[in-house]
């Protein structure tokens, strides 16, 4: 949709340790500013002063894919230059937003290179918190992929983490990029089999999706024994934090804001064990992350800091 903005600059958040695309999926209008001062812009369309390149160097190639433009923009800002997205300078990207990548390369490179960026640039006093936030995020993805039987995606999560803390850069080994097995077929097959559902909270988008899967399904106005009750939550991994019952029932399913679904006894068992599994994962992996941070600060990053001065 050419009247929608894919993104208009990027912001690096060292509080939550993530990068966000500004104005993503926002309708283009006069309310959008023409100039946006930001941390980075898309490498697909940019102009860079020669002086900035002389100071900050060329765009890093070690990432192979993803996060290279983010790191370059961030480095350029560290050398005192401004990074600005211009509304009059635009290009159109022809892509299907619903297209699913055939393999796990996006998942692998986004995870590995994002981890490397924050291990490299986070302030020393924030590294302990950074390690916990990023490891939690990776483990959550891994756990959800496991629940969705996306075993290749789950293996890609762990491969990206291990390569990040081992200092692996460049193109990934062939055994790290696998076929994408995140199909969402469990969601589809579940609603294909239902005759009636009751939604505790209105969600027109979810209702439309369910009707597309099963045009004959009936949406009840009140809960009843003949209908499956749909309960919405922020995260199916955190439903215990919202006082939802954890006893399995075939007549109740949970769907979170990312449309992940909890609908089986096996899912419920995994949810009950999520927190202790997470704590064991953090205990095992956090020291390795902090060791890699120390290696970066004593190696390549120390040299870059001297260049800044």
Feature names for model-found ranges:
Residues 1, 53, 90-91, 97, ...:
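Short, solvent-exposed loop/turn segments at secondary-structure junctions
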Residues 1-56:
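Acidic/His-rich active-site region of diverse nucleotide-sugar glycosyltransferases
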Residues 39-58, 62-90:
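A short, conserved alpha-helix in the catalytic core of glycosyltransferases
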Residues 126-193, 259-309:
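Non-catalytic, C-terminal membrane-associated alpha-helical segments of glycosyltransferases
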Residues 192-221:
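Short, charged N-terminal beta->alpha structural module
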Residues 218-264:
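Short, well-ordered secondary-structure micro-motifs within conserved domains or adaptor modules
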């Amino acid at each position: 949709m050419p009247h929608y903005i894919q993104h208009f600059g990027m912001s690096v958040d060292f509080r939550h340790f993530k990068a966000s695309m500004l104005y993503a999926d926002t309708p283009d209008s006069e309310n959008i500013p023409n100039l946006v001062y930001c941390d980075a812009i898309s490498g697909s369309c940019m102009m860079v002063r020669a002086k900035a390149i002389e100071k900050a160097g060329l765009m890093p190639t070690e990432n192979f894919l993803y996060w290279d433009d983010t790191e370059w923009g961030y480095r350029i800002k560290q050398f005192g230059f401004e990074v600005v997205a211009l509304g009059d300078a635009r290009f159109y990207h022809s892509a299907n937003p619903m297209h699913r990548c055939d393999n796990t390369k996006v998942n692998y490179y986004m995870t590995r290179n994002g981890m490397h960026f924050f291990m490299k640039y986070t302030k020393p006093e924030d590294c302990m918190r950074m390690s916990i936030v990023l490891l939690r995020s990776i483990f959550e993805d891994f756990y959800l992929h496991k629940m969705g039987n996306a075993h290749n995606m789950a293996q890609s999560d762990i491969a990206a983490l291990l390569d990040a803390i081992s200092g692996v850069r460049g193109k990934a080994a062939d055994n790290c990029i696998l076929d994408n097995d995140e199909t969402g077929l469990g969601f589809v097959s579940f609603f294909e089999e239902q005759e009636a559902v009751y939604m505790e909270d209105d969600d027109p988008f979810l209702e439309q999706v369910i009707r597309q899967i099963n045009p004959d399904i009936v949406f009840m106005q009140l809960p009843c024994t003949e209908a499956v009750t749909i309960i919405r939550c922020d995260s199916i991994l955190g439903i215990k934090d919202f006082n939802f019952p954890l006893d399995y029932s075939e007549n109740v399913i949970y769907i979170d804001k990312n449309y992940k679904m909890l609908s089986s006894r096996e899912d419920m068992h995994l949810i009950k064990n999520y927190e202790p599994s997470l704590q064991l994962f953090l205990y095992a992996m956090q020291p390795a992350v902090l060791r890699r941070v120390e290696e970066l600060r004593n190696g390549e990053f120390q040299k870059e800091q001297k260049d800044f001065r």
